[in-house]
From Swiss-Prot:
The keyword Metal-binding applies. SUPFAM superfamilies: alpha-helical ferredoxin. It is found in: Membrane. [4Fe-4S] cluster 2 binds at residues 105, 164, 167, 170. It is a peripheral membrane protein. [4Fe-4S] cluster 1 binds at residues 95, 98, 101, 174. Has menaquinol-oxidizing activity. The HmeC and HmeD subunits may together mediate electron transfer from menaquinol to an unidentified electron acceptor on the cytoplasmic side of the membrane. Binds 2 [4Fe-4S] clusters per subunit. The keyword Cell cycle does not apply. This is Hdr-like menaquinol oxidoreductase iron-sulfur subunit. Pfam families: CCG, Fer4_8. Residues 86-115, 155-184 form the 4Fe-4S ferredoxin-type domain. GO terms for cellular component: membrane. The gene is hmeD.
């Protein structure tokens, strides 16, 4: 792992508008802030092939080995985007550079670099738009905020467009509703047309295209991980539990982020899923299957390009149709929910098989079990037709009193909740996680209001920023969230921060260690698993002695 900086020094800089028109040069590209460029094995493979991906490039080299006609390719891609994407065209034209977004970006707060203001990040692209696609820019040049493309401008694009986690907090405060994340996404696509792809996200995209998940796990590895989870749960609960993998005719397809199969603390959410699904089958006959083909809920294509996103999320609907399931439950993954909430049904056609259509004509769980009658998923889903988030699903079960809960099993935890950007701002799921947590535990405390729900601060590792070479940027960008966390730790004695996002769970353990905040990191489904009483198996509330981490639930008397 890259070393994190010993001390963060933040110097705020506010140049005039003409100064920022000068692009950076190679000497301005710094370690800790620059993303490595993808290697041919990631972008020139049988499963994921990008233009000019057969060349190895070095972000710290003077020569980035751009194709000879790179400028023509970029401008053609720019023109295509303007013609096909109305929002992108509008966002190019309507910004008045008021600066309302400037101090809303965690990267600008943490770095003090003015080109990390959302307005200026977008201006790196907008200035080129003005020069080539507007009359004012063609006539007045820099006096109209326009500049021509050259290699330094392209390097600046790559450097700063990959210092954005696409969290969209800036768009919340923009009086015109400009979505800078969308500007960045389409500009990254333009860069990919000349061979400039970020290495970290392309490793995951290629692996997912090849194996079905970001980790590159094949069927045996995934199945073995789940079997290990069942073995651990027997030690904790005393019951022989089971699960289904690739089961035709199951009621539900469950899709988790692949980090849940191996990483910590993600693993404890995995155990929570398995407990819930066993209780529901034993009690109500509802069957849930995993898939080794569609074994990844996340989609790093949503950080890269439309085409990459479409390629990866196509697998899930294909598998839902092949297995004949009635609906899909998604696990604790952040960007999965922007993808499934806003993109999947326009990128790929939903399943058309009879079981799916019949269920969604009237999505009442009574179709599966008479004992579940009255739980209409249409009242709980906030995402695309056919999908429900696992926390929305648990909220429905709790509201209708279909599972038994003992919140005292979590009394050794004092929790706060981090809203993942793509779950909160991306799909509007704000209250369901809090409803679940307040039911499964007795000690829950929110962070300050201006740092949560739709105003949540980013973990600073999404959008491809989880790359190890960006460690300094990550530790700077996570500062606002860490300050809010430190507040509730001091005020309420919080000892765990919960988040339903795999990238959060990878970033925050490093961040709390760096910022010296003594808390654990986990997911809401871990707390659900702790509190869930396996009534169908004969378990009583007082029977469970250990939580899913193997920690004693109650102090020895």
């Amino acid at each position: 792992m890259s070393e994190v900086p010993e001390e963060l020094k933040i110097k705020q800089k506010f140049p005039n508008w003409y100064d920022w028109l000068k692009p950076i040069t190679q000497k301005d590209i710094k370690h800790g802030f620059a993303s490595y460029i993808a290697l041919p094995k990631q972008v020139n493979s049988e499963f994921f092939k990008m233009p000019f991906g057969d060349v190895e490039r070095d972000v710290f080299s003077e020569d980035w080995k751009l194709p000879e006609n790179w400028k023509e390719i970029i401008l053609d891609s720019f023109k295509e985007t303007l013609e096909k994407n109305r929002a992108f065209k509008v966002f190019m034209d309507i910004c008045v550079r008021c600066g309302a977004c400037a101090d809303k970006c965690h990267y600008y707060i943490g770095t003090g670099d003015p080109k990390n203001m959302p307005v200026m990040r977008a201006e790196t692209v907008r200035s080129v738009y003005r020069y080539y696609f507007t009359i004012g820019g063609k006539l007045f040049g820099k006096w109209a905020g326009a500049r021509p493309l050259d290699e330094n401008v392209i390097k600046e694009w790559y450097y700063y467009l990959l210092q954005c986690s696409l969290c969209r907090r800036c768009s919340l405060f923009c009086p015109y509703g400009i979505d800078t994340a969308e500007v960045v996404w389409w500009a990254r696509r333009m860069l990919s047309r000349v061979g400039l792809n970020q290495r970290f996200m392309c490793i995951s995209i290629e692996a997912s295209a090849r194996t079905g998940n970001h980790l590159g796990l094949y069927a045996g590895g995934m199945a073995g991980s789940i079997e290990q989870g069942l073995s651990e749960l027997k030690d904790i609960t005393g019951f022989d539990l089971h699960t289904y993998i690739n089961k035709p005719g199951a009621d539900v397809l469950f899709v988790a982020p692949s980090a849940d199969y191996f990483a910590t603390p993600h693993w404890y959410a995995m155990l929570g899923y398995l407990l819930l699904f066993n209780e529901l089958e034993e009690r109500y006959g509802l069957t849930v299957t995993w898939s080794t083909y569609a074994s990844e809920g996340g989609n790093f294509g949503t950080f890269h390009s439309y085409e990459a996103a479409q390629l990866l999320n196509s697998k899930i609907y294909k598998e839902a149709e092949r297995l004949g399931v009635k609906f899909i439950i998604g696990g604790e993954c952040g960007h999965m929910w922007r993808d499934k909430h806003q993109f999947i049904n326009t990128m790929n056609n939903p399943p058309k098989h009879a079981e799916w259509k019949k269920f969604w004509d009237d999505p009442d769980l009574g179709q599966i079990s008479e004992k579940l009658k009255g739980i209409n998923l249409g009242e709980f889903i906030s995402g695309e037709h056919g999908w429900i988030h696992v926390l929305e699903f648990v909220a429905a079960l709790i509201k209708h009193k279909k599972i038994d809960i003992d919140p005292s099993r979590n009394d050794h935890w004092r929790a706060t909740y981090h809203d993942p950007c793509n779950v909160a701002r991306g799909m509007g799921m704000l209250e369901e996680p809090r409803y679940v947590l307040r039911n499964v535990m007795n000690n829950f405390y929110d962070m300050p209001e201006h740092t949560i729900r739709e105003k949540t601060y980013c973990c600073a590792a999404g959008g491809g920023m989880l790359a190890e070479e960006l460690m300094e940027l990550r530790m700077r960008g996570v500062m606002p969230r860490m300050m809010a966390l430190r507040y509730v730790v001091k005020k309420y004695g919080v000892n765990i921060m919960l988040t339903p996002c795999a990238i959060d769970k990878a970033q925050f353990p490093i961040a709390v260690d760096y910022w010296k905040i003594p808390v654990e990191i986990g997911g809401p489904m871990e707390m659900v698993g702790n509190a869930l009483v396996l009534t169908a198996f004969g378990e009583k509330p007082e029977d469970r002695k250990y939580d899913l981490r193997g920690t004693p639930i109650r102090e020895e008397e």
